[in-house]
């Protein structure tokens, strides 16, 4: 599992990016966020996640808010 902070997340469009220290930013889609209810992330929020290969490159999967 990787750890990072949410760089930005657009609730209307349902996606954003996670900053990884010493690495490239990782795309995150709301469907990758674990938990019940409205799936959203806040800027600066710490998360853990896995990196998988998506259609357009690396993206976050199994995102858990810390």
Swiss-Prot record:
Q: Which Pfam families match?
A: CSD
Tell me what organism the protein belongs to.
Answer: Geobacillus stearothermophilus (Bacillus stearothermophilus)
Q: Which UniProt keywords apply?
A: Activator, Cytoplasm, DNA-binding, Stress response, Transcription, Transcription regulation
What CDD domains does the record point to?
Answer: CSP_CDS (cd04458)
Which Gene3D superfamilies does the entry link to?
A: 6.20.370.130, Nucleic acid-binding proteins
Where in the cell does this protein reside? Cytoplasm
This molecule's function is given as:
Affects cell viability at low temperatures.
Record carries keyword Cytoplasm: yes
- The entry's protein name is Cold shock protein CspB
| Gene name as annotated | cspB
């Amino acid at each position: 599992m990787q750890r990072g902070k949410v760089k930005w997340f657009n609730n209307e469009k349902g996606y954003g990016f996670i900053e990884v220290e010493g690495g490239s930013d990782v795309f995150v889609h709301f469907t990758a966020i674990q938990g019940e209810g409205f799936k959203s992330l806040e800027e600066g929020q710490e998360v853990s996640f896995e990196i998988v290969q998506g259609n357009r490159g690396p993206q976050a999967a199994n995102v858990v808010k810390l």
